[in-house]
Amino acid sequence: MPYSDPDKQSEYQRKWMQREGRSKPAIGTKRFFYSSCSKLKAKARDNNIEFNLDSKYLQDIFPKDNRCPALEFTFKRGDGKRIDESPTLDRIVPNKGYVKGNVQWVSGLANQIMSSATPDQVVQVGEYFKQVVEKKNAA
């Protein structure tokens, strides 16, 4: 039964998968890369974004140490929802699409940070935040 509320839909799907004895593919497995590729291809098609990836390429570029290269923590799966540590595919130059050479695996949190600002803005906010924390700790 489809729901218009994404949270209700996600909960319904999670319960169905548990009831049916199915689970999300483990990070780093062939099924994980195939599933990721399939979802990205559908997203690209629906949003008219260029796409030329395959599951083998996604596996080849996945960090061998299973860690986010930007924030350096180990990738993890959420229980039915994406979490900050979930592996996500980032388009380095968004308007180039999901094409070989323009994507990288990073955590959901790193992807959110990078998609919302320019590199200079990310550094500026980071420096400001660091100053705020240092002042608070000194007080």
Residue ranges, per PLM feature:
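Phosphate/NTP-binding elements of NTP-utilizing enzymes
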Residues: 110
